[in-house]
């Protein structure tokens, strides 16, 4: 329970915790506490090859590639000479359906790499997929939501920049608790 004086939480064992502020930083699960949908789940695909000798890899041996086309492609080598390739994100949000696409998506990614680097043998040895969330504008949602008041603060940093946004968000959350202005409040807050 959250009101204008603070938050009261009760554990499954019956213990009560009272606080002046509650910070909800529960990853994707935070969405369930908001009526407004602030992020959408998506799926990303990746595979890794068996080791490829350094001569065949050529300049790829020490290169990270990010093709910014949509859908994007990224790849890098591992210490033992494998190619780690990923991308081809889609809007599939059901794990079983996503997992059924893994082999086809890996093949599609491998074909794309082969076209870009025809001299490099690209055969997926192991492929996988994962779910991530992204916001419409690519920015995190950090701060108080109008539906819960200023005592419940959310820190929802999604996507590939989540760790960076979480660090920035920590400073913003602290400023909000201390009732100070913060330069990122308008950019990351629920008022946008």
Say what each PLM segment does.
Residues 11-15, 87-90, 158:
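Secondary-structure transition/turn motif
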Residues 91-99, 111-192:
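C-terminal catalytic lobe of FAD-dependent flavoproteins
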Residues 24, 83-86:
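Short hydrophobic-aromatic micro-motifs
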Residues 1-78:
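Flavin-dependent oxidoreductases
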Residues 7, 82-83, 151-153:
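Hydrophobic residues embedded in beta-strands of well-ordered beta-sheets
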Residues 78-81, 148:
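Short acidic-glycine loop/turn motifs at beta-strand connectors
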